């Protein structure tokens, strides 16, 4: 069932976000930059999974790449004013740049910036949850 798969992806997003928060706090407490970087990657994956849920529900298809997610979000924004108003495509790209590329791959560990980004991930999940009709 499509609806079940949508919920599985969104639940994965929530779980990855919760794990990211735990791992981030543990990494900060221990002074472990690798834990913090892993937390950023989990937070990024929360965005990816939430986006998968949204695209599966609204477009009826799962994207096969980050590029395809951005394209599908752009197409949804063109068709749906409520999606366009949330600027999800832009937000998706920014989280990718900050969490996935800068923190995880490049190793830029600015604790306060990452904490700020984690809040942005939460807001993204909240907005996607509203579009899906599920709470976060």
Task: Label every model-predicted segment.
Residues 1-34:
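Charged alpha-helical initiation segments
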Residues 5, 31, 35-39, 106-109, ...:
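Non-transmembrane, amphipathic alpha-helical segments
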Residues 12-19, 42-45, 116, 120-127:
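Charged, amphipathic alpha-helical oligomerization/scaffolding segments
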Residues 19, 34-37, 41, 45, ...:
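Residue-level recognition of hydrophobic positions within alpha-helical transmembrane segments
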Residues 25, 32, 51, 58-59, ...:
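Short linear functional motifs in flexible/disordered or boundary regions
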Residues 36-60:
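Hydrophobic alpha-helical packing segments in soluble, helical-rich domains
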Residues 55-136:
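Long, charged low-complexity segments
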């Amino acid at each position: 069932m499509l609806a079940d798969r949508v919920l599985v992806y969104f639940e994965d997003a929530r779980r990855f976000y919760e794990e990211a928060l735990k791992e981030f706090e543990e990494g900060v407490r221990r002074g472990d930059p690798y834990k913090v970087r892993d937390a950023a990657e989990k937070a990024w994956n929360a965005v990816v999974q939430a986006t998968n849920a949204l695209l599966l529900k609204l477009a009826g298809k799962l994207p096969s790449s980050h590029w395809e997610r951005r394209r599908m979000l752009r197409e949804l924004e063109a068709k749906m004013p409520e999606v366009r108003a949330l600027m999800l495509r832009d937000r998706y790209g920014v989280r990718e740049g900050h969490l996935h590329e800068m923190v995880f791959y490049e190793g830029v560990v600015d604790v306060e910036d990452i904490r700020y980004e984690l809040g942005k991930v939460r807001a993204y999940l909240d907005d996607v949850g509203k579009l899906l009709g599920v709470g976060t």
